[in-house]
């Protein structure tokens, strides 16, 4: 090599070093502006995030503000699976069917269909959020991102608390439903000669929570495979019901209920007016069953190609459960004893157990209730996984007590063991309400619904108002015309549901055993969360807290993102 070539190479290397040093000083001088932009519509300064232009999951997660700590083991099918598993159609319908029959067959059939349509609209909007900013924290992160400047921290903190407690209440309601199903199976084997007490139910419930805690502490790859098992288990039991129940009904009961009974028989078993009872009895089965699609969001940091797989998981799980659940209810109403009161007053304590017993006999009823209980267990394991990821993410941002311990991730298995333990302990404590009476148990169902709907609707309202100039769509987006129409319609439905779940099952003669304590517990939790933040937590919680250094950030996002951020800085 000639001397001139060596000199040219030396100069080229020196120029690159000089350029890199200059860029480093330039980036260092940007300070907090290194990764942020300022809203023009009142949302203040937030991270620059553009999912549509990100080239991989790690880059997008870095733009959001976090390093990759959990392993991405969930395929699109398994992301769908965690929501579909938690919805657990037949086990969930079994748990809420008694309340739905309070308005007669037509209320249950059409209430499900109408409510599920609006739930799909809510899910579509959440899918847009998840496609734009896929992070395990989800709801409280989005709230902080779009909320007005000066209110970001307290509102996002309240939403984080609401979502965490609602998911924990969801664990309680699912596991309590499992306890009831196991008790119903035992009662069937003893021909009704078994006393089910609140103490026995809590014992079964607590045992289930402990077993689920152990099961969900395995590596994320095993948890992902569990979702595949749950998909096939739920589909198997549904197909079995579609085949066996009509055959048994025709053989043992001589035929089916006609279309007028299934689609037109309305029977108000409360003292509310017919319209309100239709909403109370008809909407709640679908709202509670198809109510865990945000679990896909909480798996965002374990999902492959999250900006696409999470939206697909949300929308597909809702759509499948909408139609498949509706067909299940039609099948059950075709086969049910026309004397609804005899089903609701079943000595087995479970309306579905009585329907199966009437059509198929004792052995089939025991087998079905055992299979339903198994699927309900898979539901519980899946929602325990989801709530642990929400608890972990919120603790990562110092949102919970003992956050410095809860946010730890095991380096070998990439699993947040302490978050799983915290979620299960919280569920056991909330579950103590079941020892009081049925009204307190019902409050757990209502708390899960109200808390989640508040958490789901809040970031949407802010995205459409104060943060409208910050929203950068991901791969899934309805467009500028349809997106806000769908979003506002979903918000209106969610506000209606929050109000609806606060009402008791009857209008007059309310006693302590018929009172709906959700109207006290829900708002009480939200108010206490705000007070707790003002008095203590504001010293530690400042919204989503990045765990990336500036060097890690610039390396992860690349020069193009840095150039875009710098070009958007105000002079």
Curated annotation (Swiss-Prot):
InterPro entries according to UniProt: AA/rel_permease1, Amino_acid_permease_CS
Gene: UGA4
Key words of the record: Membrane, Transmembrane, Transmembrane helix, Transport, Vacuole
Upregulation: In the presence of GABA.
GO biological process: gamma-aminobutyric acid transport; putrescine transport; transmembrane transport
Cellular localization per UniProt: Vacuole membrane
Top-level lineage group: Eukaryota
Origin species: Saccharomyces cerevisiae (strain ATCC 204508 / S288c)
Keyword Chloroplast appears in the UniProt entry: no
Chain's role: Required for high-affinity, high-specificity GABA transport. Also transports putrescine.
Remarks, miscellaneous: It requires NPR (nitrogen permease reactivator protein) for its full activity.
Family under the similarity heading: Belongs to the amino acid-polyamine-organocation (APC) superfamily. Amino acid/choline transporter (ACT) (TC 2.A.3.4) family.
Alphabetical list of PANTHER family matching this protein: AMINO-ACID PERMEASE BAT1, GABA-SPECIFIC PERMEASE
Cytoplasmic side: 1-73, 127-153, 220-228, 293-312, 386-416, 463-482, 536-571
Its membrane topology: Multi-pass membrane protein
Location, primary (coarse class): membrane
Vacuolar-side positions: 95-105, 175-198, 250-271, 334-364, 438-441, 504-514
The protein, known as: GABA-specific permease
One Pfam match: AA_permease_2
